């Protein structure tokens, strides 16, 4: 059964144009990834508002119409965006939200796409994690209620 499950995930990854590492999607070259986990596993309506400096949303992204997730993984959902969209600074600005409900304390968040190709965010936690292992440890320290 486990082999069948992995085969199905691998076929889904091929269809989506992504590569799975374990059960995580590898970020394609030239893109950055934001991974998001919720304790309730309910991602319906949650999206990504992302912009480049000085506050110019990426094409097609509006507050009322956030970017839907690119895909799912064992961690949760993820978004892949083109790093070039963020301009020469490659500063990735974002808010994960559902309507006016915002993650990470409702703050505008950012990270350097030059230094970090991928980040992980746990619901109810303000911290940005730079590895999956850090995110899992963060969840252990702040378990789901």
Language-model-detected regions and their locations in the chain:
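Bacterial N-terminal signal peptides that target proteins for export
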Residues: 1-11
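Sec/Tat signal peptide C-region and signal peptidase I cleavage site
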Residues: 9, 21-26
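Hydrophobic core
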Residues: 14-22
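Aromatic-rich carbohydrate-binding modules that target alpha-glucans
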Residues: 40-87, 100-109
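Conserved structural position at the C-terminal beta-strand
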Residues: 96-98
């Amino acid at each position: 059964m486990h082999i069948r499950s992995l085969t199905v995930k691998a076929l889904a990854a091929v269809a989506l144009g992504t590569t799975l590492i374990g059960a995580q999607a590898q970020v394609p070259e030239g893109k950055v990834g934001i991974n998001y986990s919720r304790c309730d596993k309910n991602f319906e309506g949650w999206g990504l508002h992302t912009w480049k400096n000085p506050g110019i949303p990426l094409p097609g992204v509006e507050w009322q119409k956030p970017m839907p997730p690119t895909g799912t993984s064992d961690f949760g959902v993820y978004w892949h965006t083109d790093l070039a969209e963020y301009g020469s600074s490659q500063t990735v600005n974002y808010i994960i939200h559902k309507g006016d409900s915002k993650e990470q304390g409702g703050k505008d968040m950012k990270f350097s796409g030059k230094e970090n190709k991928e980040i992980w965010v746990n619901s109810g936690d303000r911290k940005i994690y730079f590895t999956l292992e850090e995110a899992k440890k963060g969840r252990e320290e702040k378990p789901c209620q």
